[in-house]
Amino acid sequence: MANSERTFIAIKPDGVQRGLVGEIIKRFEQKGFRLVGLKFLQASEDLLKEHYTDLKDRPFFTGLVKYMHSGPVVAMVWEGLNVVKTGRVMLGETNPADSKPGTIRGDFCIQVGRNIIHGSDSVKSAEKEISLWFQPEELVEYKSCAQNWIYE
């Protein structure tokens, strides 16, 4: 399949606490993407600081790390045609107030500081984030029986 790629998606502590894990996974599955990695964990502050290293000079960095460390997260790797770009569209804007209805943030969020989900913003950042959160042996290679019904 041409342009098949992987993206990193993380359901943040507020999404876990609000019971939205199943709904979010359902949306990605129904779209036709394939789940190839999944972890439920309490992320360490060191992991979070590395993950958000590009934001380290921003005034909200310390609060972001504290928030992400405040509860469990669901870390996932999804695979499919243009999954990075399409995944970002499915998430909605970082600020939920700017997100359209039908997007995850548009349907379930109100405030930017509690926007329930993270998604890689480029193929390059997806590769970095996946390697940070997952070991290669934790990612599963398989062909979905639905693949021929999703892709030409």
UniProtKB/Swiss-Prot annotation:
One of its GO terms (biological process) is UTP biosynthetic process. It comes from Mus musculus. It comes from the Eukaryota. GO terms for molecular function: 3'-5' exonuclease activity; ATP binding; DNA nuclease activity; GTP binding; identical protein binding; magnesium ion binding; nucleoside diphosphate kinase activity; ribosomal small subunit binding. Major role in the synthesis of nucleoside triphosphates other than ATP. The ATP gamma phosphate is transferred to the NDP beta phosphate via a ping-pong mechanism, using a phosphorylated active-site intermediate. Possesses nucleoside-diphosphate kinase, serine/threonine-specific protein kinase, geranyl and farnesyl pyrophosphate kinase, histidine protein kinase and 3'-5' exonuclease activities. Involved in cell proliferation, differentiation and development, signal transduction, G protein-coupled receptor endocytosis, and gene expression. InterPro entries: NDK-like_dom, NDK-like_dom_sf, Nucleoside_diP_kinase, Nucleoside_diP_kinase_AS. The modification N6-acetyllysine is found at residue 124. It holds the Pfam family NDK. Belongs to the NDK family. It is found in: Cytoplasm; Nucleus. It is linked to This protein is found in reduced amount in tumor cells of high metastatic potential. It is an enzyme of class 2 (transferase). Its EC number is 2.7.4.6. This is Nucleoside diphosphate kinase A. Its cofactor is Mg(2+). It catalyses: a 2'-deoxyribonucleoside 5'-diphosphate + ATP = a 2'-deoxyribonucleoside 5'-triphosphate + ADP; a ribonucleoside 5'-diphosphate + ATP = a ribonucleoside 5'-triphosphate + ADP. GO terms for cellular component: cytosol; early endosome; mitochondrion; myelin sheath; nucleus; ruffle membrane. There is a cross-link at residue 100 (Glycyl lysine isopeptide (Lys-Gly) (interchain with G-Cter in ubiquitin)). The modification Phosphoserine is found at residues 120, 122, 125. The gene is Nme1.
